[in-house]
Amino acid sequence: TDSCPWSHGSLASNTMYRVGWATRAAANDARRQLLEIAGREFFDNAALDDLDITEGIVHLRNEDASNRRVSISEVLHVLRSDTLGQTSSITGRPAVPMPPATTFARQFGAQFVEVEVDIETGQIKLLDFVAAQDSGTVVNPQVLKNQVVGGGICGAGFAIYEHLVFDEDTGAIKNGNLLDYKLLRAADFPWKAEVLFAESYDPVGPFGARGAGESPIAAGISAVAQAVYNATGVWVDLPMTPERVVRALGGV
């Protein structure tokens, strides 16, 4: 925190905005430093606007590709040092705080869940999971898929298991540990979860992207709740524990 500027923190689905813009600004700063060194050392003090980087190679914008070309590693070699612990590196840093207008945008998601409900025991089993997510430009497909699936797991856990039990006399939490506070395990969620991306372009997000923190959780809760209703014909209070399912079905 000594070198981190003040911010609202990684919350409210703002991480893509805050970290994304900061990373992009830092990368642009590092690129600027790299081109300054390259222009001075290899291109006769060429201006920044006259240089470009293509696939790790620094070159003049308006010259044929066969002309002077220098790799990034060669540029960094200029910074070499014989001092132990010194490395040839450039550190990029964003120069200004991110404007407040770039910290929020709505995200959209829908999830579909197939469940099996045992009407005798009230047990709910998740059979299939499909999600559609619009979080702007998909910067990293695998990371976004993991985020959506993780949100779906969290939402399903809220719908089926997770709740705090309080002592009626003292108000103390009675299940304040992972032995008594039930969570979904890997085996409880469909292993072949499918995520579809509906890409759009967010005008204020980094590269048109926006967050995906909360919508997968909210969609997961409602998807499981409605799937149980479609299977049983009754609405069950959340979390839909076996006891509550049996009671809703008139078995208790």
Regions found by a protein language model. Name each.
Residues 1-252:
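C-terminal catalytic domains of large/alpha subunits in multi-subunit enzymes
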